[in-house]
């Protein structure tokens, strides 16, 4: 099960990397730790959860909005999805913000 060294939630984006399939999922949240946890407890992206449940290994990276160079979570998320090809070659179903 995931364990987090961080104990304080923050606004930002998170990158879930499926090491077994070389696929990314990028999401955003005002409380990033809660959003990350949702994906591994069946309350987030169903495909991510299914792969995790059946044994795929994941790594997690989180980027705080503060000092990221972006003004909004939407901008940071869109940029991160594009950077990791999470829409074209990953789990993301949109290019960001449900667009």
Could you describe each region identified by the protein language model?
Residues 3-5, 20, 57-59, 68, ...:
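Generic serine detector
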Residues 1-34, 38, 71, 75:
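GIY-YIG nuclease catalytic motif and its immediate N-terminal context
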Residues 80-81:
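Serine endopeptidase catalytic core focused on the charge-relay Asp
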Residues 84-99:
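Coupling/hinge elements of helicase-like and P-loop NTPase modules
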Residues 1-2, 53-54, 64, 85-86:
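Short, solvent-exposed coil/turn linker segments
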Residues 30-75:
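Conserved short loop/helix modules at catalytic or binding sites
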């Amino acid at each position: 099960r995931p364990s987090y060294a961080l104990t304080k939630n923050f606004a930002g984006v998170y990158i879930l990397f499926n090491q077994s399939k070389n696929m990314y999922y990028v999401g955003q949240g005002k409380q990033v730790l809660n959003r990350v946890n949702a994906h591994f407890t069946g309350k987030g992206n169903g495909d991510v959860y299914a792969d995790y449940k059946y044994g795929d290994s994941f790594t997690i990276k989180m980027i705080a909005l503060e000092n990221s160079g972006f003004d909004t979570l939407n901008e940071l998320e869109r940029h991160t999805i594009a950077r990791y090809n999470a829409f074209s070659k990953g789990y993301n179903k949109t290019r960001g913000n449900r667009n």
